Curated annotation (Swiss-Prot):
Protein function: Component of the spanin complex that disrupts the host outer membrane and participates in cell lysis during virus exit. The spanin complex conducts the final step in host lysis by disrupting the outer membrane after holin and endolysin action have permeabilized the inner membrane and degraded the host peptidoglycans. Host outer membrane disruption is possibly due to local fusion between the inner and outer membrane performed by the spanin complex.
Keyword Lipoprotein: yes
An individual GO BP term: viral release from host cell
Species in which this protein is naturally found: Enterobacteria phage T3 (Bacteriophage T3)
Membrane topology: Lipid-anchor
UniProt xrefs under InterPro entries: O-spanin_T7likevirus (IPR020130)
Keyword Signal part of the UniProt annotation: yes
Keywords, sorted A to Z: Cytolysis, Host cell lysis by virus, Host cell outer membrane, Host membrane, Lipoprotein, Membrane, Signal, Viral release from host cell
Taxonomic superkingdom: Viruses
Record family assignment: Belongs to the T7likevirus o-spanin family.
Protein name (record): Spanin, outer lipoprotein subunit
Gene assigned in the entry: 18.7
Range of residues in the leader sequence: 1-50
Length: 83
């Protein structure tokens, strides 16, 4: 009788372990994909910051002197109020 009980117990444990393995197989690819994505983000960030990439220089803008206002409005107002 103990052998039948042991066989049933072994069978039940085997079924439980199979269910556990199947559930791991379903959730493991999700975790694996998330970890691979996180790893790739880290690698890209590290390689991007260490590459010392040369950014294009901003264009040097020159302003035509005829567009500049002489005298300045504040100095003109100070002259008006000081008189």
């Amino acid at each position: 009788m103990s052998t039948l009980r042991e066989l049933r117990l072994r069978r039940a444990l085997k079924e439980q372990s199979m269910k556990y393995r199947l559930s791991i197989k379903k959730t493991l690819p999700r975790w694996k994909g998330a970890l691979i994505g996180l790893f790739l983000i880290c690698v890209r960030t590290i390689s991007g910051s260490g590459s010392e990439s040369n950014l294009p220089e901003p264009p040097k803008v020159s302003v035509d002197s005829s567009l500049m206002i002489e005298p300045n409005l504040t100095t003109e107002m100070l002259n008006v109020f000081s008189q």
